[in-house]
Amino acid sequence: ESADYLYDPKPSGTRWMHSHFGLQEQNLLAAPLIIRDKAAMQEDAQEVVLLLEDFSWTSPEEIFANLRKPKKMMSMGSSSDKEVGPDLNDVEFDAFLANDRTLDDPEVVAVEKGGRVRLRIINASASSNYTIDLGALEGTLIAVDGNPIEPLSGKTFPLAIAQRADIMVTLPSDGSAAAVLAHCEGRKMRSGIILAPKGATVAKIATMTDSEGPEIGLAQELQLRAAAPLAAKKTQRRIPVHLTGSMSSYIWNMPIEGQGGMPAVVSAQQR
């Protein structure tokens, strides 16, 4: 059964759809949802969508049960001089996927020699952050979470869980292939795809690296500027939201202050 709907698709941009029922997202129930505006459709660039996911042979229910088991407490009187690093990952995944594939058999996308490519990258992982590594390519970040920004250039870009990044790249004029890699935060594993013009040599890329993926911080976030920012307007209302939770029970909450668990009611155009 099918149905046709006519509507104004706003907002446009790189979006994604995924289940919020139980733990289905960990079972890879997610897909890209790309809404193109007129400018994107008229753009002189090839589009390549990259969906990143983390995968485990262990069932999501068992993973969640293990996370909620009582944790061993570290002795405060420990004589060890070893520095304790940040707790970056709670789940040991078996693989990291780029468009459903690992680097053992990556997707090879046909592109034009010297052509422009708009990468629409989606972090659909349940519990993993990444650093996007363009290797020898120089990229220009033009949109984040589907929203256009003032261009930001670089070779690496952090991508947190559920985030999206639109990155423009220009392929080498010599016709060589280029890899777009996603290195998992705090892990030596990575995934990615290959952009390859006709006749290009596609070299084998190892899944494992010598070093762990870097910790994701807020440095890039602080540089982001909206291409079309909200109009200046005095704040009319403030709604405090608390981030709470417990590692021991693995329960996390975002209660709105003073609402007793009820939603805050707002009105249209209210700032």
Question: Which residues make up each language-model segment?
Answer:
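Aromatic/His-enriched, Gly/Pro-containing loop or helix-boundary segments
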Residues: 1-16, 20-22, 153-158
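Non-cytosolic beta-sheet module surface loops
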Residues: 9, 21-23, 122-125, 134, ...
